[in-house]
């Protein structure tokens, strides 16, 4: 049986989730790019109570994803501009450094908690610390997790029943499942 994630590492992912949600909420309020969050989920994010946002931050998986395996669009963030770009850059750098550190500590936990691929972890483990600031300037480096499951974001932002939250967690941790299957199964749980 694989080792259970360290609570310290899980707490760290929860902190990163809080920062990511705060960035997304600010971006949604100002009608800026929400890093791939579906428009319906943007509205739900703005309407979510602080308690629900905290519950979402406690999700046992990163709510963001690093796109190290994907081709970059070429758009870069200018951290010296401050404001939005500065906040986006800081968030990206923090997540990137955390992913690098986690992938060096435990590939199992990096895959489980952050959804990092083997290729991404190899790249991060071999990357000098001095390369991180330049990589963090790529605007599409950090995006919302579960991009193909917009319905999952809606449910995560609305559902507070423990049994439904548990099922959402299981769905999110099994990205290889048929994408429509979980939606049908989740609908059976709804009142």
Per-region residue spans from a language model:
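Membrane-interacting alpha-helical segments
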Residues: 5-14, 77-94, 143-153
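Aromatic/pi-system hotspot detector in well-structured domains
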Residues: 20, 52, 56, 92, ...
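N-terminal interaction modules that seed assembly of large macromolecular complexes
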Residues: 23-66
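Long, low-complexity acidic/proline-rich regions
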Residues: 180-191
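Amphipathic alpha-helical packing elements
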Residues: 30-46, 88, 92, 97-140
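Extended, low-complexity, amphipathic alpha-helical coiled-coil/linker regions that act as scaffolds
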Residues: 2-10, 120-127, 131-159
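Intrinsically disordered, low-complexity acidic/Q/S/K-rich activation/interaction tracts characteristic
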Residues: 1-29
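Long, compositionally biased
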Residues: 56-81, 138-177
């Amino acid at each position: 049986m694989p080792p259970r994630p360290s609570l310290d590492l899980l707490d760290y992912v929860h902190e990163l989730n809080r920062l990511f949600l705060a960035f997304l909420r600010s971006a949604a309020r100002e009608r800026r790019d929400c890093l791939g969050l579906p428009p319906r989920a943007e509205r739900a994010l703005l309407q979510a109570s602080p308690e629900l946002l905290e519950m979402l931050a406690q999700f046992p998986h990163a709510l963001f994803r690093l796109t190290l395996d994907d081709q970059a669009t070429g758009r870069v963030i200018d951290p010296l501009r401050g404001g939005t770009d500065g906040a986006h850059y800081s968030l990206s750098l923090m997540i990137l450094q955390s992913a690098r550190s986690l992938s060096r500590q435990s590939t199992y936990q990096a895959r489980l908690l952050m959804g990092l691929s083997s290729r991404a972890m190899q790249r991060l483990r071999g990357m000098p610390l001095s390369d991180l600031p330049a990589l963090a300037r790529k605007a599409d480096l950090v995006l919302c997790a579960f991009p193909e499951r917009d319905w999952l974001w809606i449910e995560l932002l609305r559902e507070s029943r423990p049994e439904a939250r548990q099922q959402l967690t299981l769905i999110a941790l099994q990205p290889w499942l048929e994408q429509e299957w979980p939606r049908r199964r989740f609908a059976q749980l709804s009142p």
